[in-house]
């Protein structure tokens, strides 16, 4: 492979990565969410959502209502949580939410940060679930939880790259 082909291959890969990044950032701006697509990681929302479902979020509504499925983050924890709004109250400017997983026995007070009784809709929510694809995200769970699957995927990608020259 000559220098021109290698440079073309590099530029093609750079274009693919930059296009993917721009598509993600555009989706983030449109949905007003830093993470507009999430994968369900646990069974706490069964039967509504199963582990591995991909959820599409929207974060442009001013208020959430009881029954909405929301994704929120706790300060100091990296993993977003998908649960249903159990109770809400608000004052003139802020809305506060109490959530619970459909498959859980108790509400989420024990999950919230210390001395936090409710979620602040403006600061804690990543978004409200508007659509989903069942089981499609299970591949990401398999790769993140299984070291052998990760190495197998990496090996397949390397072999494919060597054989096709791309």
UniProtKB/Swiss-Prot annotation:
Q: Principal place where this protein is found?
A: endoplasmic reticulum
Q: Could you provide one GO biological process annotation from this protein's UniProt record?
A: signal peptide processing
Question: Is-annotated flag, keyword Zinc?
Answer: no
Key words, A-Z: Endoplasmic reticulum, Hydrolase, Membrane, Protease, Signal-anchor, Transmembrane, Transmembrane helix
Q: Which InterPro entries match?
A: LexA/Signal_pep-like_sf, Pept_S26A_signal_pept_1_CS, Pept_S26A_signal_pept_1_Ser-AS, Peptidase_S24_S26A/B/C, Peptidase_S26, Peptidase_S26B
Q: Name one GO molecular function term.
A: serine-type endopeptidase activity
Active site residues according to the UniProt entry: 44, 83, 108
Subcellular location(s): the record lists: Endoplasmic reticulum membrane
Q: What's its catalytic activity? A: Cleavage of hydrophobic, N-terminal signal or leader sequences from secreted and periplasmic proteins
* A GO cellular-component term linked to this record: signal peptidase complex
PANTHER family linked to this entry: SIGNAL PEPTIDASE COMPLEX CATALYTIC SUBUNIT SEC11 (PTHR10806:SF6)
Oligomeric and partner information: Component of the signal peptidase complex (SPC) composed of a catalytic subunit SEC11 and three accessory subunits SPC1, SPC2 and SPC3. The complex induces a local thinning of the ER membrane which is used to measure the length of the signal peptide (SP) h-region of protein substrates. This ensures the selectivity of the complex towards h-regions shorter than 18-20 amino acids. SPC associates with the translocon complex.
Q: Which family does it belong to?
A: Belongs to the peptidase S26B family.
Full protein name = Signal peptidase complex catalytic subunit SEC11
What species is given as this protein's source? Meyerozyma guilliermondii (strain ATCC 6260 / CBS 566 / DSM 6381 / JCM 1539 / NBRC 10279 / NRRL Y-324) (Yeast)
